[in-house]
């Protein structure tokens, strides 16, 4: 399969739920021209059970997930939503304050375009509850040529339960046959009308 691209960063601030009830989000946002890379990593238990000198069982259930994002532009709004930075009005404009408060939680997703045997599909991801941190902020001087520099975030996906008897969920995946359907699915997840 060919992975042809990634688009449509969509997010909404987490407000409540996921503890046996549906999740509520604040106002959702869908961005264009932001996604460069997404790294989805599943964390799994790795326990083996031995008897009579050989392995008779194993357990590898999912224990967590992480989402790494490389973005073309880290705006003030993204830093406030994803990292918990606080805006403060000053005489010279607005400043972003980096405080000791923990970053808030967001639901977020994106889609990637895939091609297999000539058929195009759009694989959508939605992470129910993620807490992001910035992977540093380094800058280099301009040399003979401009060097594009981007920022990366790492998000810790927390498990949620949408029903009292339900499984722990970290993220949802959905395949759509058209780009417009992929965009609509993400908007629905983020509560965007």
Label every PLM stretch briefly.
Residues 57-125:
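Structured, beta-strand-rich domain cores
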Residues 4, 16-19, 25-27, 44, ...:
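Feature targets compositionally biased, intrinsically disordered low-complexity regions
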Residues 22-29, 122-130, 172-175:
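Short amphipathic beta-strand/extended segments with alternating polar/hydrophobic composition
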Residues 13-16, 84-86, 161-162:
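Short regulatory "switch" loops immediately downstream of catalytic or recognition motifs
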């Amino acid at each position: 399969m060919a992975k042809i691209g990634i688009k449509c960063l969509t997010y909404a601030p987490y407000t409540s739920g996921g503890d046996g009830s549906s999740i509520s989000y604040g106002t959702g946002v869908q961005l264009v021209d932001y996604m460069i890379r997404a790294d989805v990593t599943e964390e799994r238990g790795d326990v083996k059970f031995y008897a009579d000198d050989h392995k008779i069982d194993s357990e590898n259930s999912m224990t967590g997930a992480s989402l790494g994002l490389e973005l073309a532009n880290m705006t003030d709004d993204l830093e406030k939503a994803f990292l918990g930075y606080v805006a403060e009005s000053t005489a010279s404009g607005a400043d972003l304050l980096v405080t000791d408060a923990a970053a808030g939680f967001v639901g977020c997703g994106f889609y990637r375009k895939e091609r297999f045997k000539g058929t195009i599909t759009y694989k959508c991801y939605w992470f129910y509850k993620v807490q992001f941190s910035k992977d540093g902020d380094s800058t280099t001087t301009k040399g003979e040529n401009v060097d594009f520099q981007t920022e990366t975030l790492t998000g810790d996906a927390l498990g949620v339960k949408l029903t009292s008897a339900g499984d722990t969920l970290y993220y949802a995946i959905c395949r759509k046959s058209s780009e417009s359907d992929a965009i609509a699915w993400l908007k629905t997840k983020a509560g965007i009308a």
